[in-house]
From Swiss-Prot:
Name of the featured protein: S-adenosyl-L-methionine-dependent tRNA 4-demethylwyosine synthase TYW1
Catalytic activity, as annotated: N(1)-methylguanosine(37) in tRNA(Phe) + pyruvate + S-adenosyl-L-methionine = 4-demethylwyosine(37) in tRNA(Phe) + 5'-deoxyadenosine + L-methionine + CO2 + H2O
Keyword Iron-sulfur belongs to the record: yes
A GO BP entry: wybutosine biosynthetic process
Cofactor: [4Fe-4S] cluster
SUPFAM superfamilies: Flavoproteins, Radical SAM enzymes
Residues involved in FMN binding: 85-89, 176-208
An example molecular function term from Gene Ontology annotations: FMN binding
Amino acid sequence: MDPSADTWDLFSPLISLWINRFYIYLGFAVSISLWICVQIVIKTQGKNLQEKSVPKAAQDLMTNGYVSLQEKDIFVSGVKIFYGSQTGTAKGFATVLAEAVTSLDLPVAIINLKEYDPDDHLIEEVTSKNVCVFLVATYTDGLPTESAEWFCKWLEEASIDFRFGKTYLKGMRYAVFGLGNSAYASHFNKVGKNVDKWLWMLGAHRVMSRGEGDCDVVKSKHGSIEADFRAWKTKFISQLQALQKGERKKSCGGHCKKGKCESHQHGSEEREEGSHEQDELHHRDTEEEEPFESSSEEEFGGEDHQSLNSIVDVEDLGKIMDHVKKEKREKEQQEEKSGLFRNMGRNEDGERRAMITPALREALTKQGYQLIGSHSGVKLCRWTKSMLRGRGGCYKHTFYGIESHRCMETTPSLACANKCVFCWRHHTNPVGTEWRWKMDQPEMILKEAIENHQNMIKQFKGVPGVKAERFEEGMTVKHCALSLVGEPIMYPEINRFLKLLHQCKISSFLVTNAQFPAEIRNLEPVTQLYVSVDASTKDSLKKIDRPLFKDFWQRFLDSLKALAVKQQRTVYRLTLVKAWNVDELQAYAQLVSLGNPDFIEVKGVTYCGESSASSLTMAHVPWHEEVVQFVHELVDLIPEYEIACEHEHSNCLLIAHRKFKIGGEWWTWIDYNRFQELIQEYEDSGGSKTFSAKDYMARTPHWALFGASERGFDPKDTRHQRKNKSKAISGC
């Protein structure tokens, strides 16, 4: 048998397969393709059956033999509300906003910026799908509140630090509402603007235009800061609802000027890509132009602005800015002509807005004020209550013979031009540099002031300890202290009001904060005119009084000079704040020479309790011995004056000019009946028959003098002291 033939028979099938391998591969490929097609058809038919059997909103997908519900897209996972507050207003707004957000079934968190570390946590908001809301207030000198100080410092530094870059917060969504007072024009809502700007510079996306709340009821867009916030909140909730649905409302690309949004135009998205770098460069060069502000309510129109939607050369930015400014001015002029600006500071009826807003009314009512009309108030002094019980009167009783239980403390103007750190009213009253509110007539103010005062006195009828004769006397007002709150001299009809007081045989004690020299010069004669001298240098006055006027120091000096020409009794009121203004003796002496006052009251600051608006504590209240030491040192520098009286209970001393020391006796008290005769003669003569302070002075009793054993306490009354004696913490 041939071996080669056997070998051929063994390998011949394999050789045949090799020769026909192409056809074999082709068959396999066709088979696999057919199998894949069959599987696709089967799955497609199964999916169609599921779509028909299950509601569209809850379609199921078959995955590895299991049924799973299709996940719904989440566009907003929650809202974080950050607040920086000093007096609690921003915190209150945060709570109100949180309630509104909760109604949308969204998780919400309220965060105090004081407890938040942006270095560790702010970057988390890039991917969190949260919307971050910042409610920030502007405080003294345009600075942030204490609670927001670190956050703002960090954010500012990060916005200009190249290590963070322009996209550090890209993906973060935010909105800003600022709280401020346009009376401080140069710093109005500065913190809100800055936070908005810095977030934008770091790449965060603004979901709506910045809101600005204004405490100035006249300039406030909606009449009060609360109304401003409500209007902004409504828009924010509407925007939030749209974001929840995944809708993309047209929002600002960050290239707007002075609240005018350009992003509504066609091609704005392309412009955002192309001109972002140029806008940021221009912003850093001209910060005041605010290219980061926006508004979804206003649009630029016309062909002139189409050029702004394309890439702009850096060299042309100046021309563009001039063009925008010009158009803005033209638009404002057109609005003014059309009467849009006539309603500034007016209500829906076209009348001037009332000074007292609902929130202010609530705050002052809680403090015990009886509010009168739209801008006045009256309150019962604690010394009135004390003297009704026969427990002694205030320092004005000791120094000038006022009957404290017959003294009405009131003001025709709750507004003030300062925000003094030691203000008793915790800065709940409005501020302003001129009268811009609705004005009530002086006759109505005086009538209601007396009625309200009498009603408060009536509440003491039958109260244990109240003396019947004092109660009856208290029903007849004999003195009026225009020192309650605010700046009474701002009231345009203050002279008429004073004349009405004198016609009612009521003496007048008017206190002014030395910021209105012209009004002081034009003031009609009063029984006694006070000027608050809270500091003796420009820097310390700014620190303590926090005035609105930019030229506050010159106004202060001019007010003191205006006092020098007054013929009636004039008084400097010095309030000592420990560690703030007690080391300026020489400067105080120089101020005395400007106004040559008849008297100088030196009083330790009154502690009014804790307040978020003030940093004063009991540590700032000087002991009476410290006040006495200060007065001794001051008198050594002003040779025409001596220490006359003391009221230890009020932590107060009186320095008097030597002209009131006659025959070795002090005549600091007032003959009130004689004053009424003199003022009547003055009025009858049309102002030609003048009189001076010495014409109605009266001898000071021995118990009121400095050095007397009574220390200013009237021996007719019964001394009442608390068991735990401490610093004097209240006064009038």
